[in-house]
A protein has these predicted regions:
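Membrane-embedded transmembrane helical bundles of large multi-pass transporters/channels
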Residues: 1-37, 102, 131-391, 502-505, ...
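Short, conserved active-site loops that position catalytic residues or coordinate cofactors/metal ions
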Residues: 34, 68-69, 73
Length: 720
């Protein structure tokens, strides 16, 4: 099939190029704008308790004041606030109120209750119109700028924090991160390609095709799918898409380019060489893309909206890239003369001895048992380190630098006031018998909630709805609302809230900590559902590719070890050496996405080469030698580019991207340089022909570089 695709693409190269350009423009112009959300509650299904509580709050207390932002006041000299300072703070809040800033509904003046115990800090809470669009940042920018202007000429320093300010800072941080990641990936890919091929055109061509055609097409299709299926996008998605498109697109380009150069060196005419390259590597690209796409698409089964959106989005990006890699890319390459393509290199036709990879192949050929034991033992050792993994749920502080103003405010509020005061939990008690709540039961219920371990205080008077059917008990926790300790408190708080609820009522616990506790539960569900389904589907794809029921098992086992080893190494680096309390809760999913899914690419490329060598009549150990000798440079180059691309995440300057960057770069390196280069060939050599059971049938031996009769017939068409 791929030979026929190659013939069509090469014969009608200009038609293929024009068709791609027209399709890219048409799809991009008609696509909707992709809006994103960073509100964690947006990513939970509606049946979780925290979401049900939020819905109840909106119904029972439609006029309730919910602060969207907060002004933090302090003296510039760090001293205690004076009477003059309090007057200046009133001037600031009154001035902002008088401006009637769009969507600002309420600005609460500073009072005695909003001043810290040490007298150095004061808070003014700000409420937005509930109908204000979440994507609106102009209101928050104006509030921040005008507050600083009004505080000018005083001894006060004023900063804006809260959810609205966090959203603004996350957006700014995300834009900066995207630019740094794109620039870093671009430069690294150009340098690595230039080093590999010594060619001006090859070093820049894949990036031009990705940026000009593949990326706009993918982004437009993702926007269409997101709107069509009502999915939620996240600011993290854009940075990940950049790296996936650049990294995976360049990887598939390398898969094709190495084979194309190999066939040219074997003496095939230019156009026939491209047909042969597509025919030989097309199946590997399609299978690799299929495995990655399935792994990504399975995330549609996730409980979390974040992964429901990012999985299909990445699947669309990979499918688009794979289709372009076997149509657009070969069409462009086939119209470029060989001298121009490889300029200024002059010795590209001469195959280098490849002594390093030949030596590695020879080592595996001679001692496959030792190679399998050492590489497998290394993976197992790192996997054991994953037992120390701990998750943390403070997504806001993890997704941007701690120097951002909203983060400074958050940390100051937690230290100057009660740690949980920045975002109290809410316990809603609502009548189930149609009668108004009995207020006489409130004191006992308040006392029961206050007795829960981890609770700092409970507001003495709950807020009662107008119809008297629902009461809101505000509960301040002892710990930071986003901390693991606060999330652990949720179990006890929910248990007490439910069991101590007065007769004829039911209780629901809401608030940010409750949302994060539910996210934790949803993640546990996803680990038990998504991972096994993805593993089974990837094994099916591997079985279809290899016509074997044996090889998929040890290939998936090696990928599983790669996942565990990556998580273990990341846990050691960030928890042990960087002294972090835990890794971001979503990190295991990201490791799964890229190490399991994309890491399978390199295993597929190597196992496909092993099968090809075996079909040419070589013994299992000889096949391992030839596969590493010829496939090793491709795997090493592709792995280096993708690992380097993900390493650029660490340029973003925030905890989440640093963890993602390190873990995925390390995992990709493991996949390429340990699993695909040593573990998989060594195991295949040890298993021998049993690895291909029952589908392997050995044809007549074909010497390396020898054309088959089919190749000769196809080549005749291009010798005019």
């Amino acid at each position: 099939m791929f030979h026929r695709i190659g013939q069509f693409v090469v014969k009608r190269a200009w038609w293929v190029i024009v068709a791609w350009l027209i399709a890219a423009v048409a799809i991009s112009v008609t696509a909707p704008k992709l809006a994103s959300s960073d509100d964690e509650s947006d990513f939970l299904p509606r049946h979780y308790e925290s979401i049900v509580a939020s819905d109840l709050q909106q119904q029972a207390f439609p006029e309730a004041f919910t602060p969207s932002a907060m002004l933090l006041f302090q003296r510039t000299d760090g001293g205690q606030l004076t009477a003059d300072d309090k007057a200046a703070m009133t001037k600031v809040t009154d001035g902002l109120t008088a401006e009637h800033i769009q969507y600002v509904q309420t600005i609460v003046p500073v009072n005695d209750k909003s001043i810290s115990k040490d007298g150095k800090y004061a808070l003014s809470l700000i409420g937005y119109d509930k109908n204000a669009p979440q994507s609106n940042t102009d209101t928050t920018k104006k509030l921040r700028d005008d507050a600083k202007t009004l505080a000018g000429g005083t001894d006060l320093k004023v900063q804006l924090g809260g959810q609205a300010a966090t959203n603004l800072d996350q957006q700014d941080s995300s834009s900066t991160a995207d630019a740094l990641i794109f620039l870093g990936s671009f430069v690294l890919i150009v340098v690595i390609l230039a080093f590999i091929f010594r060619s001006a055109i090859i070093s820049i061509l894949p990036l031009l095709l990705i940026m000009a055609v593949i990326m706009p097409t993918s982004n437009a299709l993702i926007a269409d799918a997101t709107k069509l299926f009502g999915l939620k996008a996240n600011s993290t998605m854009s940075a990940i898409l950049i790296v996936v498109l650049l990294g995976v697109g360049t990887d598939y380009f390398l898969f094709l380019m190495f084979r194309y150069r190999e066939r040219l060196r074997a003496g095939e005419p230019r156009k026939q060489a491209m047909v042969s390259a597509i025919g030989r590597v097309g199946e590997a690209i399609a299978s690799a893309a299929g495995a990655v796409t399935v792994a990504f698409a399975v995330l549609i089964l996730s409980s979390l909206g974040l992964f429901k959106a990012i999985g299909p989005a990445l699947a669309i990006a990979v499918v688009t890239t794979a289709i372009a890699s076997i149509t657009l890319v070969p069409a462009v390459l086939s119209v470029i003369p060989e001298k121009a393509l490889f300029w200024p290199g002059k010795k590209w036709r001469v195959e280098k001895p490849g002594a390093r990879f030949a030596a590695l192949g020879r080592m595996t050929q001679r001692r496959p048992g030792l190679v399998a034991a050492v590489s497998g033992g290394f993976l197992i050792l790192l996997t054991l380190c994953s037992l120390g993994y701990k998750g943390t749920f403070d997504l806001a502080s993890g997704s941007m630098p701690k120097t951002k103003e909203s983060m400074v405010v958050q940390n100051t509020v937690m230290s100057a006031f009660s740690a949980g005061a920045s975002d109290p939990s809410q316990v809603y008690v609502t009548s189930t018998n149609g009668s108004p709540l009995d207020k006489s039961t409130f004191p006992a219920y308040t006392a029961a909630l206050g007795g829960v371990k981890g609770v700092s205080e409970v507001a003495p008077q709950p807020l009662l709805s107008k119809d008297g059917m629902t009461a809101d008990f505000s509960v301040t926790l002892k710990d930071d609302p986003a901390s693991n300790a606060a999330i652990a408190t949720m179990d006890g708080l929910r248990s007490t809230a439910h069991s101590a609820a007065p007769a004829g009522t039911k209780a629901l616990v809401g608030g940010q900590t409750a949302v994060e506790a539910d996210i934790n539960a949803a993640m546990d569900h996803d680990y038990k559902t998504v991972f096994p389904i993805a593993a089974v589907l990837i094994m099916v794809i591997l079985g279809l590719l290899l016509r074997s029921v044996v090889a998929p098992w040890y290939l998936m086992a090696s990928v599983g070890l790669g996942f565990g080893a990556t998580l273990g190494a990341t846990s050691v680096v960030f928890q042990k050496f960087d002294h972090q309390s835990g890794l971001m809760f979503m990190l295991p999913i990201f490791i799964y996405l890229f190490v399991v899914a994309i890491g399978t690419d390199y295993n597929i490329l190597m196992i496909a080469r092993l099968r090809e060598e075996a079909r040419e009549g070589r013994s299992p150990r000889e096949a391992a030698y030839e596969a590493i000798k010829h496939g090793g440079p491709t795997v090493a180059s592709a792995g280096s580019i993708l690992a380097a691309s993900f390493a650029t995440f660490m340029l973003a300057g925030n905890v989440l991207f640093s963890e993602i960057g390190f873990s995925i770069a390390f995992g990709i390196a493991l996949s390429a340089f340990v699993m695909a280069m040593f573990f998989t060939p060594a195991l295949t050599a040890l298993l021998g022909r049993m690895a291909w059971w029952p589908g392997h049938q050995e044809p007549e031996p074909v010497a390396p570089g020898q054309w088959t009769e089919r190749d000769e017939l196809v080549a005749a068409r291009y010798r005019k």
